[in-house]
A protein has these predicted regions:
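Feature captures hydrophobic
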Residues: 1-132
Length: 132
């Protein structure tokens, strides 16, 4: 099972218009690198709670404050419409399945509600791309 690549334009629209994400990310300034196995990697840049850009080209040399990384299989489980046990959220996936949440732990813990909502929005974008 492989992860569905995320539509970054749709993701940017979702992030900018989702009231829960906007509320939880207020005052956040961070670069979030997302690594979906070998299939896709991108960086979300947030400045003062607003999406500044989503960079679709990320290298191992690019800096980040937070990294969400896992294999394609882990991401497939996380992005499923009904995720299997312990894949409903990044933190239990890290504890039980080896998913990685890395970077500035103080920022991660302070803004975890925004990071968790990010996962929900990733799921909504991925589910909309699955062919019927």
């Amino acid at each position: 099972m492989t992860a569905v690549p995320l539509d970054l334009d749709a993701l940017e629209r979702e992030l900018g218009s989702d009231p829960e994400f906007v509320l939880h990310s207020r005052y956040l300034t961070a670069s979030i690198r997302v690594v979906i196995g070998e299939a896709q990697s991108f960086r979300i840049v947030i400045r003062d709670g607003a999406i500044a850009e989503i960079d679709p080209v990320v290298t191992p040399f690019d800096s980040y404050d937070i990294q969400l990384a896992g294999s394609e299989e882990q991401w497939s489980a996380l992005l499923a419409a009904t995720p299997p046990p312990f894949y409903q959220d990044f933190y239990p996936a890290m504890l039980h399945h080896g998913f990685r949440i890395e970077g500035d732990m103080e920022t991660i813990m302070a803004y975890y509600p925004a990071i968790r909502r990010l996962g929900d929005l990733f799921r909504s974008v991925a589910v909309s791309e699955v062919p019927a």
